[in-house]
Amino acid sequence: MESTPVSRRGMVAVVALFASLIVLGSASSALATEHHPKGDFAVFNQCPLSNPATNVCIFAQTESGEFIVGKKTVPIKNTITLQGGVHVIFNAEREIVGTEFIGAENGVTLSKTPQNVPGGLAGLVNCFEISNFFERIACEVIFENGLTGVTATTELAAPASSILLSGQNLIEAEGTALFLPVKVKLGNPLLGESCYIGSNSSPISLSLTTGTTSPPAPNEPITGKIGKVEFKDEAAVTVIRENSLVDNSFAAPAAEGCGGIFAFLIDPLVNAKLGAPSAAGHNTAILSGTVEQGNATYVKASE
């Protein structure tokens, strides 16, 4: 294995890193083609090789970091996986002029990985803030019965093709490396199945960079990290470790759909605790981990 500083060699579209955060995904397809690559290519078993446009296979994992919305910080402690492929677009001179992301073969482009929310339900819902006596009693009966754990799960708020990648950013740390429209599901039996920050029509739009951000106040600039690159199989596989993508310029909408039929009571309480909706300059995403990219031709040949 060869280790070297990041360069253009073997770096086609490797900027398809993480999501973070942000776990996300769409329904899997029962008709998806199964692939069984071998050796160093085994991690690319969900590369969309059935799509002839796929030039590069992507397997990326967010292993640490944090997601801050308004007043609430959620550390990333459970690994989030992003997988799929990239169609690399060349001009007549065979120069790379763009990329298009292609979702995973089984449809699960971004894993739905729950992260524990510090403080649990007590950190999101405070029934004492309800002034109406009967509504406050109803809140206490429903939300103060011991089911206190809350998780936050990041999901894609648009098709995988909405993911935008830029190899230029990973190489030179300028501009956006990875664009992701996401929504965050708050999980707890008492919050119901439809408690989300963001939606398909009003997503949290992350523009992640390995460079330095330029957020509005009160946030201050933060800087990502390109990471360390290794080559396997004569550069047919590129591995980037200790990579960090950051964004602290995005806005976050209010949470909606929390508490089922009691959403009219619970949504305002959750949003008060979160500080949502939260304007740009009050939120932060830091996604750190490892990305692997492989030449699709070699991946297919290894099966």
Q: Can you name each region flagged by the protein language model?
A:
Residues 1-32:
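Secretory targeting and sorting signals
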Residues 33-303:
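Extracytosolic secretory-pathway proteins
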